[in-house]
Amino acid sequence: MSHPLKAWFQCHAPQLRLAVRVAVAGVVAYVIGSAVHLPQVYWATFSAVLVTQASVGGSIKAAVDRFIGTAGGAAYGGALGTLLPHAEVQHALLLLVATLAPTAFLAAIRPTFRLAPVTALIVLFGTALTDLTPLQAAIDRVFEITAGSLIGIGVSLVVLPARAHDLVGEAARSVLVLLVELIAFVNASFQQRPSPVDVDDVRARLVTALALVETTAEEARRERRTYLASEPDPSPIARTLQRLRADIAIFGRAAVETFPEPIRTRLGPHFAGVADTLSAFLLKTGDALAHRTAPPELGDVIKTLDLYAAEMSALRDAEATRQQPTEVAGSVFTLSFGLQQMRADLIDLRNRAAERARD
């Protein structure tokens, strides 16, 4: 296999595994549904495909949501269809309103029920071409969708299974890579050099990456609640990443100021040292989170932070900051505060990575 093709497969391995699971789930659901003579086997096939997610925890959540929405909508639609006449057009319109309004409202306030309006309609009007009563149709739909959902979960557990706890580490690494790009922008601004990255694009991708960490962490918590995993709670990782982003935002806003001499000349090399060691630590920690290995030590980062703090103290003793405008002095101290705040969060990040290490 050529190197570019191999690299492409490695880069898209999670997506390829998901594609295989979805295909297997659909085929298995159709075969089993046909073998047991489900009334409408395609509902089981649809459910198996929709339930199969990127992780086992995601599949469980999708299955639970689908079952709750389907059962609620089918029960409501079946009851209305049985109790209320709808042969006449005017009756059908009233029944349509009575069906959609409550279920749509419920779906709006409880996203778990987002399938309820559709299922209720299917139960009500899907019987027009069959001899089934609405109640019989409701029972069939719930049975078919439940069967498909269980098949989807089973395939997620057996075929190239992906645990959300492992995906959390990969998602966290993506966030840390983007934080390193932000640090490169901040350092370039401090040194009054052109930015090596498009900061607006980085910030937009960072929002998406952090949201993915939150979603994956929730799926991992669901795996823990269903006893499919006994890993540490991933929630602290998501919170630590949010705090690190806030830390970088704090000292980043201060660093983009144009500092006069001698502040920029004296602090610039030390800030560059912090940026270099911090970036190296975050990248190595991201790899450790993704591969479940021991994280790197913080010694180099702490050393450069201490050197920066010492130079800042020397500037303060020399009253260099008092000679500057209030805005400049405020930015200098904000920069120092952000860096010191980040020290505690870096220690927390390393501890969280160490908890997840398997070696």
Segment roles from a protein language model:
Residues 241:
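Positively charged, phosphate-engaging catalytic surfaces used for nucleic-acid and nucleotide handling
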Residues 1-17, 31, 167-234, 246, ...:
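Long, hydrophobic alpha-helical segments that serve as membrane-spanning/inserting helices
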Residues 23, 35-39, 244, 301, ...:
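Short linear sequence motifs
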Residues 1-210, 217-218, 351:
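A transmembrane helix-and-boundary motif of multi-pass membrane transporters/channels
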Residues 238:
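A contiguous, well-structured pocket-lining segment that forms one wall/lid of small-molecule binding clefts
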